[in-house]
């Protein structure tokens, strides 16, 4: 009887020790978050993204014809949904409807963000679509942060410009700001995308966390389908909100 009790004791202690070791390992693993932008225009192609692990999040364009559908599908799977908000770029090009601009009043920005929240149900955060002119404007981004605070949304800075004012603008508000470290698909070349994916993994390993942004393009989807199943054991996929309290550093640098 004593032997049996001792054996159960050993088994229990061993299980507890293994559990503790797994918790420590998970805490030390590099955290990688992947967000797929520009969702809401091509449900057939975008459905391939919804076949990936549910830690992969989607950023939905608020005025896209299938915005509500794709946000709802993603949320029903337990995915994190962001609003992919059009913001004014530095380059001179035609602007999409309801593109946020530095010259807009607080009321106008509030109206646009309110509509976006209505069009993209279940959103818990927002990131910028283009936006180098808007995100580099401190007054403009302060208006954005005031609006986001009222909806309790975080802001993922896509870092389309190195002089982004998003973090400064959020000071004094309840809005958390996180930063993109890697763009996966600046090109449609699979080798380039694979290289960028590996870079994101290495940054997550070195810095403790990293956020990569990609798009629902065939080459990107193909590379992710190939590489996600063989993600290194010391890297864990997480949703962006899991990184809200992680050090953000300087982001991923300027991309035109």
Segments (PLM) and residue ranges:
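Catalytic-site microenvironment of enzymes
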Residues: 2-18, 25-256
């Amino acid at each position: 009887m004593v032997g049996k009790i001792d054996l159960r004791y050993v088994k229990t202690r061993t299980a507890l020790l293994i559990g503790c070791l797994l918790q420590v390992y998970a805490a030390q693993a590099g955290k990688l978050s992947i967000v797929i932008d520009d969702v809401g225009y091509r449900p057939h192609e975008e459905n391939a993204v919804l076949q990936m692990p549910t830690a992969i999040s989607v950023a939905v364009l608020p005025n896209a014809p299938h915005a509500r559908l794709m946000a709802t599908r993603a949320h029903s799977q337990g995915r994190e949904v962001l609003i992919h908000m059009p913001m004014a770029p530095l380059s001179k090009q035609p602007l999409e409807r309801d593109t946020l601009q530095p010259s807009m009043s607080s009321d106008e920005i509030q109206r646009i963000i309110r509509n976006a929240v209505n069009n993209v149900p279940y959103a818990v955060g927002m990131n910028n679509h283009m936006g180098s002119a808007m995100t580099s404007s401190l007054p403009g981004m302060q208006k954005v942060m005031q609006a986001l605070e009222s909806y309790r949304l975080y802001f993922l800075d896509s870092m389309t410009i190195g002089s982004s004012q998003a973090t400064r603008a959020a000071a004094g508000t309840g809005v958390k700001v996180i930063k993109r470290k890697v763009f996966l698909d600046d090109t449609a070349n699979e080798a380039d995308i694979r290289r960028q994916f590996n870079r994101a993994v290495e940054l997550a390993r070195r810095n403790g966390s990293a956020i990569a942004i990609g798009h629902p393009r065939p080459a990107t989807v193909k590379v992710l389908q190939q590489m996600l199943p063989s993600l290194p054991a010391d890297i864990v996929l997480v949703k962006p909100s899991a990184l809200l309290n992680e050090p953000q550093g300087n982001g991923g640098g300027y991309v035109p």
